[in-house]
A protein has these predicted regions:
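Nucleic-acid substrate recognition interfaces
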Residues: 1-189
Length: 189
């Protein structure tokens, strides 16, 4: 009886975006909200740890409510998925800090120095145009795959906008290949 194993592998592509002024304003708003959400998560974590040291027995910090309770309503103007991805990335940063060696603590993000990016999902591709939530269609240049999209990260580098698309890709391997790869890796280590 032959058994094949199926692995889910993530692959990525980067495409260049050509947004108009309105979309550029929207992207900058999303970058600002992403930065603010990260910094609020970090401030909540610091306050939680200080309260723990003073034996005040705090509850676990609720990042969600404090991120959305702001005066300028950035959360309503920006993409709604940003908050979820920021909290997830922040928690992963702390997990890496405690589990891996040579990883620094998560810190506050400066808007000028940090990489201006945000992550979302459910993009729609129609021809050579990309449609994101709460955004008009944007022209892009690059090749796409026909696989399922896991998420998309919009980032700005040198005043140019790019999208990093992460695809889900299935790979089928036979047991002998897995056995051989496992022992080859052990041999190299």
């Amino acid at each position: 009886m032959k058994v094949d194993y199926i692995f889910m592998v993530m692959k990525g592509r980067v495409i260049r975006l050509y947004p108009k002024d309105r979309e550029k304003e929207f992207f900058n708003l999303c970058f600002r909200f992403n930065n603010r959400a990260w910094n609020i998560c970090h401030a909540n974590q610091i306050a939680y740890r200080q309260a723990q040291q003073n034996n005040l027995m705090p509850n676990y910090p609720n990042h969600g409510k404090s991120i959305t309770n702001n005066k300028d309503n950035l959360d309503k103007k920006a993409d709604s998925k940003i908050k979820n991805y920021v909290v997830k990335a922040y928690n992963q940063g702390w997990k890496k800090y405690y589990t891996e060696k040579n990883v620094n603590k998560p810190k506050f993000h400066s808007f000028r120095k940090s990489r201006k990016s945000y992550t979302t999902d459910k993009p729609i591709f129609e021809g050579n145009k990309l449609t994101l939530p709460k955004c008009q269609p944007i022209k892009f240049k690059g090749q796409l795959l026909n696989n399922e999209i896991a998420n998309i990260t919009i980032f700005m580098k040198n005043e140019k906008y790019y999208a990093s698309i992460i695809y889900k890709n299935e790979i089928t391997q036979k047991p002998f290949e897995i056995f051989f790869c496992y022992y080859y890796i052990l041999f190299l280590c």
